[in-house]
Each structure stands twice: as structure tokens, then as C-alpha cells.
Amino acid sequence: MGKYFGTDGVRGEANVELTPEMAFKLGRFGGYVLSQHELETPKVYVGRDTRISGQMLASSLISGLLSVGIEVYDLGVIATPGVAYLVKKDGASAGVMISASHNPALDNGIKFFGGDGYKLEDEKELEIEALIDAKEDTLPRPSAQGLGMLHDYIEGVRKYQAFLKTTAEGDFEGYNVVLDTANGASYTSARAVFADLKANLTVIGENPDGLNINVKVGSTHPEAMAKKVVETGSDLGLAFDGDADRLIAVDENGEIVDGDKIMFIVGKYLLEQGKLAQDTLVTTVMSNLGFHLALEEAGINSVITAVGDRYVVEEMKKNNYNFGGEQSGHMIFLDYNTTGDGQLSAIQLLKVMRETGKTLSELASEVTIYPQKLVNVRVKDNAAKKSAMDVPAIQKVISEMETSMNGKGRILVRPSGTEPLLRVMAEAPTHEQVDHVVDTIVEVVEEEIGVK
């Protein structure tokens, strides 16, 4: 991570940390870095989610892009993976998504995709940061015909919808589905896609007002969807987050099916079809012990990375794997798209149900999840977050708790990549054990570096 770029672009409270001035600089300098080797006039796609600050930041970012001679195509409200898909398909120079994903409405973020549809490499981000921090802006300032132009690209969403539908390889007629679009980016696509695939739909979280994105809806709050699934007697529920790069499901009984279980279900099906590259699934350190045991039982190899879908994708690209993801619901199908895609993941999950004839609860029952607890501790600042593991008292309590578990469980303490939070997670055979371990560590963290 750099000074401005975290694990998922530049994030902060909109108009306080992530200001219009910063958005302009990111557009100007980011656009320059990503297009300086173009032989023709560079073309950049810009999308956003439904946050009230999105239009403000988009106008500033676009101004920066135009100032260095870039042709900008405004996609409007669209899912993050839609930007990545269209950039690669249309041969654009780069793409930019304005979103803070699952974060609340007061936050926003800006992330870049290269012309290949993948998130930027660290080297490119550092190059952009160096230009932002330079004492003087020495980039070209073209005038008249050298300036870029802004184009509305409303058909981009329709192209993305058409792509999603092709991945179903059939339809979902007869399935009753609850969709939760989190009052976010997928409200422009999810209903249309699944209706065209002939599913019977009930949709919640489909009325964004700029402030209600992720509020008691979406993949981080699936309770409302679970209730609706039971009320309507639906076969399953599918919840996306604010920018629709995640999926969390709910079975016909209202039980949550997280990213680990979805990855197992789809991974096992791909293995049986001979379509799981090298019989391997890529996941992160956050995935549950029970998930790994189920993979082993099914004959699936696993490769573990640091937390963050960018690290999963890097591993997949490096070793030619085609499927991976995170417990949080990011799932990457490199045979279809370059980044996590909630709607694509939902289609693949429904496809497994259709092809096997099994209910979601039957498919998910093959994974026995160990009790897990995760607590986010708000710390003083980002410096405290990064140095937390150097604090003797924190080191000591983690060591003591690991000893107390006798090898039957695990502890993971790590800084958030996007917020001043320290994440404390543990897994153990019983809920009592996991509560004791996490609560004990959290108490020490709060005492040492927490916000008083």
C-alpha cells in the first residue's frame, strides 16, 4: 500500500478526506500515467455507485482526465465489475470506478483498472502518488483541439447485462429468487438480468437515495433478505454490496451461505465438470478451517493469499488458476471477468442448483463451518493500525491465546486495508472458546491503541 492508495484504491470520507481537489488530481495524474504510451487518443471509462458524493467526485475526476487530453466515456451508475469488463472488451485505455464498496454513504473511493481490465499494479499507483506529491505540476496542458471530450455511454450497462446473461448457459425458469441490490450499483442491472433469465423475482434494496447505500441491506446486512426469503417461500436470496463485486446468499430456510460455502459449491461443480484449473481454488487467510477441510475431502487443492481480492487475482494470474475468492463474497471467475463480480457469482451459483437439481441448503450442507468471531477495533489512526503487532502487550495476549487453543483453532489479527481498524478474528471448536479468545485480545487492543 502507498500513501494514498490502499488495497482497493483511494478511500476516505467524501469531501473531507477524498475531496474534489484530490479527485481532480487522481484524474489528471492517473489518466496521464495510464495513457502516456498510447498511440491514439486515449479513452477512459468512468463508473460510479449510488452515493450522493459520486456525482461531485465524478465531475472533478473527469475534469482531470479531460485536462490531459483523454476521451472520457461516462457509464453512470454501474457495478464495479461492469467497468472492468467493458474496459477490456472495448479496448479502452483504462477504467475508473467511484465507490467505497460496502462502506457507509459518507465514504467514497476511486479505483483504477488498466486496459487489461485488472486493478492497477503497485508500481503504477506509486507513479501516480509521486505526481500528486510533486512540488509542481509539470504535465502537458493542451488547449483547444488537444483537450479531451466527455461522452455519455449509457449503452455500457446494457452491454454488461448482455454479457452476464450469456454466462448462465440457459435460464432459471421456475426458481423463486429474492435479490438485494443494497441500494447500490446493481440496481441498474440485477433485476433486468435475472428477469430476462426467467427467474421469479422479489427485489429489495432497490431504491437508492444517495444516503441509504448498504443501510440494513446488501451483502453485509443479509438479515432483511433472509426474512423475505422465508416470507415468500423463495428458493434462495442473493445479496450484493454497494458496488456489486460481492455476493452473499441465503438458502430456502433463511440460513446465510457465505463466500466460503459458495466457493466450495461452485468449485466442486467445476471440478466435477473438469473445468477447475489445476483442481485448485485460491482463497485468503480469512477462509474458515471447515471450508479447507471440505475442499480436502472433495479433492480440491487450495492456495492461500493475504486478505484482499487483488491478492487472490495476482495469485490466479501468476499460476493460471481460474477460480478463487474470499469469505466476504468476492469471487473471481477469470474465465469470464477480471475482478470479483457479485452478479456473475450469483448466476454461477444458480447454475449449479439447476444442473444438480439440489436445493441451496443441500449443497451448502457439505461444509461444516467452525465457530468464528470477527471484531473490528477502531484505533487512533492509520499509524497505530500499522504498528499494532509491534506493541508488546498485544503480542503477549495473542501468544497466550494461541497456547490456550492447543492447536485446535486459529487466530488472525490484521489491519484493515481501507479504514483505521484492527480486525481480530478467531476460530475454535466451540462458541465459548472463540468468544473468550477474541474478547480477551480485543480488550488489550482497545486499552493499548483503541479510540478512547
Curated annotation (Swiss-Prot):
Coiled coil location: none
PTM description: Activated by phosphorylation.
One GO CC annotation: cytosol
Binding residues for Mg(2+): S101, D241, D243, D245
Active site location: S101 (phosphoserine intermediate)
Keywords: Isomerase, Magnesium, Metal-binding, Phosphoprotein
GO biological process, one term: peptidoglycan biosynthetic process
Catalysed reactions, as listed in the record: alpha-D-glucosamine 1-phosphate = D-glucosamine 6-phosphate
InterPro entries assigned: A-D-PHexomutase_a/b/a-I, A-D-PHexomutase_a/b/a-I/II/III, A-D-PHexomutase_a/b/a-II, A-D-PHexomutase_a/b/a-III, A-D-PHexomutase_C, A-D-PHexomutase_C_sf, A-D-PHexomutase_CS, Alpha-D-phosphohexomutase_SF
Its EC number(s): 5.4.2.10
Source species, domain of life: Bacteria
Modified residues (Phosphoserine): S101
Cofactor(s) it depends on: Mg(2+)
NCBIfam families: glmM
Protein name: Phosphoglucosamine mutase
